[in-house]
A protein has these predicted regions:
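Amphipathic alpha-helical interface elements
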Residues: 1-169
Length: 169
């Protein structure tokens, strides 16, 4: 499995022009990051254990191919901070929510604001989050949907890259 570089991640996310495709790509990138991280949980395994136990667990049809199951295992083993677990879970849940919608909201919609307001890697970055809040609740004459949407996309991109950096084994 090829490792994604930060440039690859930025390029893939920047290429997305709507929230649905962005979140689909982000979900895919985060799942890839988790798959890269999982083998580090199984340390000092001999060849037989790796072949008959670890590989089937990590296979695409294996139980750890589900992002939620893999996250729970990583968190339960104490290999992930609570904020990181919450952020990835939140991304996964929002992606599943968007996947079920007939009409996908945009970057500037209230449901998206509610989502990013609960992503720790965004809210803990005071400069970024304060700028987003100022833009979101600015006077109508100052507010620009295109500019705000761009800021939201940037914030979400930073959240994904921050999360991936934390998943380094």
């Amino acid at each position: 499995m090829a490792t994604l570089t930060e440039d690859d991640v930025l390029e893939q996310l920047e290429a997305q022009d709507n929230l649905f495709s962005f979140m689909k790509t982000a979900h895919s990138i985060l799942l890839h990051g988790i798959r890269q991280f999982l083998p580090s949980l199984f340390v000092d395994n001999d060849e037989e254990i790796v072949e008959y136990a670890v590989k089937p667990l990590l296979a695409q049809s294996g139980p750890l191919d589900d992002i939620d199951v893999a996250l729970r295992l990583i968190y339960a083993l104490g290999k992930m901070d609570k904020w990181l677990y919450a952020d990835i879970t939140h991304f996964s849940q929002f992606w599943h929510y968007l996947n079920e919608q007939d009409e996908t909201p945009g970057f500037a919609d209230d449901i998206t604001w509610d989502f990013i307001s609960n992503v720790n890697s965004i809210t803990c970055n005071a400069t970024l989050y304060d700028a987003l809040k100022a833009m979101k609740f600015a006077d109508f004459a100052v507010w620009s949907e295109a500019r705000f949407s761009g800021m939201v996309k940037t914030a979400l991109t930073l959240a994904v890259t921050t999360t991936l950096k934390e998943l380094t084994p």
